[in-house]
Structure formats: structure tokens, C-alpha cells
């Protein structure tokens, strides 16, 4: 698999770990990397839309509930699975925050509630009157919008945004949340907490996709004392 060129790096890596599991857990042998080198898997950068592109996509989503769900992801950085599982009790308008449950471990992170998102949700409540989950499913009370249904929202929106050639998905808006925060100057450690990343390296990847504004970059040479004299031929 390592040399025939017929398998994707991810498949090779899965085969590697399966073989190591068999060697260590079934045959109870000590594993050494010398037996087989760890396959290298190229890291791909996250797909990110510009803020103008985000506006175009949101404008292409006609259904108010569907548009609100995507705006919720973009405003909070929630994963799609976290978004659909948000309950009404997770929205704390008094403290101005959203409580996001992270997976099965029920670990929780608190994300600031944007004034724009809060206003949007109030309009949403008036129209849909959700009872339990914020984004209820077709079954009504006690059910929530499915992950596949949220993916379908973006799939349909792509037909309405032919100028955007990027194959964006709902998760793209989580990437946009982090990247646009960086572009607006939010501290990387703050973004790590907002995203729920246990490892900072998962957050660092957004440094590679952010668009740098030349007006925000201060060159250290420009801040030296005594520049006037240094820039003249003596």
C-alpha cells in the first residue's frame, strides 16, 4: 500500500493502525516503528469563504429556519451536530451567551451571543415557536433538525450561488467563524476556547487561510526610534 500508489494516504494510514492493533492486541507483540514507518498524510487546509461570499450564500437560502441555522453556525462556531442539538435552555439571553454541549461526554463550552444573532433568534421564535430544540425537525416537539438536512441546505444553496466555485458545506461556516475572527484581530487562544479545540494545533491551521489586511500589519522598522536620522545618507 505504501509503494503501489493505488491507495490514498488516508487509507494507508487506516491500514497501518489496523495492522498495529492486530499486532499488539491480538498477537500481543511489541510494536516498533522500525517494522513499518508511519505513513505521512498531507494536511489539507480548511475551506473558507470570504465575508462577501458568506453574505451571498445566506441570501440564497430562502427558508428562514434554514438560513437561521447556518447563521447560528457562523456566529457561534458550532459543529453541525452541536447546532441541531441546541435546546432552548442553552440560549442564555441575560448573560448573552450560548451553552454548547460537546458530543457524548456532555462537555460544555460557552460562546458569546452576538446581538445580531439574538435579534435574529427572537424573530425566529415568533415565527416557529420551538418548544424543546431550537431547530425542531419535521416531527415537531421533541425532535430536531437532522445533520443530513442541514447539509442539504448548503447543497441547495450552491445552485443559487454559481459564482462561488468552492464546494462549501455547513462545516465551512465553522471554519469561516474562526478565520474571520482571526482577520478581525481575535486572540488565537480565545478562538481555541470558542471552537472547543483541546489542542491548539487544531486552531493554528486557520493562520494559513486568513486574509491579511496590509493596513493591520505594522512593520517593526516603522516603529524604530530615531528613524528620521537613520533614513538619511550621512
Question: What feature does the model see in each segment?
Answer:
Residues 1-234:
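Conserved catalytic core of the tyrosine transesterase superfamily
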